[in-house]
Amino acid sequence: MLTLAHYLVLGAILFAIAIVGIFLNRRNVIIILMSIELMLLAVNTNFVAFSHYLGDVHGQIFVFFVLTVAAAEAAIGLAILVTLFRKLDTINVEDLDQLKG
């Protein structure tokens, strides 16, 4: 039987993997976006675990809102990346530090 602690450890591991992904790979924007999405999924895992543990559905409902915002963020982020790649031929973070009007 899985307890609340198992789900919280899983969420902590997923969150730690996402943090490591951001700090180890600061050059590729796609990896950074994927790491942020993994962070949000770790938080959603904790929301569902606490919601199930407390017998309340508010945490599960909140997960739908977080997933909606995460999907919109991913779509907008990837659209911006495609535009930047077409203009600059790179997606490295170090090359995207200049703003041009």
Curated annotation (Swiss-Prot):
**Is Plastid found in the keyword set?**
no
Q: Name one GO molecular function term.
A: NADH:ubiquinone reductase (non-electrogenic) activity
What parts of the sequence cross the membrane?
4-24, 30-50, 61-81
What's one GO-annotated cellular component? NADH dehydrogenase complex
| Main subcellular location | membrane
Q: Can you tell me which family this protein belongs to? A: Belongs to the complex I subunit 4L family.
What task does this protein carry out?
A: NDH-1 shuttles electrons from NADH, via FMN and iron-sulfur (Fe-S) centers, to quinones in the respiratory chain. The immediate electron acceptor for the enzyme in this species is believed to be ubiquinone. Couples the redox reaction to proton translocation (for every two electrons transferred, four hydrogen ions are translocated across the cytoplasmic membrane), and thus conserves the redox energy in a proton gradient.
What's this protein's name? NADH-quinone oxidoreductase subunit K
The source organism is: Burkholderia cenocepacia (strain HI2424)
Question: The organism's lineage?
Answer: Bacteria, Pseudomonadati, Pseudomonadota, Betaproteobacteria, Burkholderiales
